[in-house]
Amino acid sequence: IATVPVTIVQGTKTEDLDGNILFYSKDGASCMDNKGKAIWNQSYEMQSPILSISGAVCALGDYNGREIYVCDKNGIRGTINTNLPIRSLSVAENGVVAAVLDDSSATRINVYNGNSNTDEAIVHAKVSMDKSGYPISVCMSPNGRIMMVSYFFMDSGSMKSSIAFYNFGEVGENQTDNYVSGYDYLNTVVPYVQFMNNSVAFAVSDDRIIFFSGSEKPTVVATSLFDDEVIGVYHNSDYAGVVFRDATGEASYRLDVYSASGNKIHTQLLDMEYSDIIFHKEQVIIYNSESCQITNIRGADKFVGSFEKPVSLLLPTASAYRYGLVTGDSIDVMELN
């Protein structure tokens, strides 16, 4: 129903930043509103940018580099100099950043206040392989109070994973290293940990999904085991979705949808080679550059159709019937009848 021409440089990635459009590449980042109006841009030099988004705040760092830019829709909030090579990072909605850093003798997890320019961490954690394992995934809660870490280690020849929670608020102050709860899992790897909101988190391993509840000391509330190969994990504050290769041969993929309490509420088969899956309000939006399928949370089709030109990003809006589309040369608005 509307289109605005924009110039998008080749090799630029696009992400939804709380309804605005974040563009980033090796050379810099910029932000536009959903009507195509430029809000800010920041140039930098990165070899392989890594991005974390929480609500309206994002952190951009360079894998193996030492700089992290913390931004929101209004521009740069602060720049962090880590002094050690960055392996991964996670930002909270309040601009606090957890960064996994490579030190020659150990791996460090440092937490920074990214709301100003800093090279001083507010929390230092030194991790050694023989004691706690290697941190393969880190996530901050939206309010920045809890950090969730998945560790992996070999224990006398067998694989072991451990999920730990650290509380940087009053509850964690009296605990050693702010550690408030943790769980061990044998013979599995947990490469994905994520907060859905401030009191619900989940983890996906190669054979299960685990839900945790609690805004101070998270505890396990539900676990579901699976046999099939995990292809992707998607979530919002209310739902989590895991995509598998479909073993039955009926379709290419299978999407299992879970509520925040860890109940599996729906399974749907997917034949589309999708580029992203978005949970928005009570909808599931599955799309690639050419086509789009929108269902309700229980899989009933609300819309199935094709785009007029290739789409790199679909943006849900406040209306459940209106979506922004970023193409190679425009930002369009699509409205469902």
Positions of PLM-derived features:
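A short beta-strand motif characteristic of beta-propeller blades
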Residues: 1-7, 35-43, 74-81, 119-129, ...
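Repeated scaffold domains used in trafficking and secretory/extracellular systems
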Residues: 5-16, 44-56, 84-95, 129-139, ...
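Extracytoplasmic/periplasmic/luminal assembly and interaction segments
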Residues: 6-56, 62-63, 259
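Hydrophobic beta-strand positions that form the internal "hydrophobic ladder"
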Residues: 20-21, 58, 96-98, 144-147, ...
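Structural motif
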Residues: 28-30, 66-70, 105-112, 155-167, ...
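Non-cytosolic head/periplasmic domains of membrane-anchored proteins
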Residues: 41-150
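Acidic, serine/threonine- and glycine-rich low-complexity intrinsically disordered segments
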Residues: 132-256
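Blade-level signature of beta-propeller repeat domains, shared across WD40, Kelch, NHL, RCC1
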Residues: 297, 302, 306-337
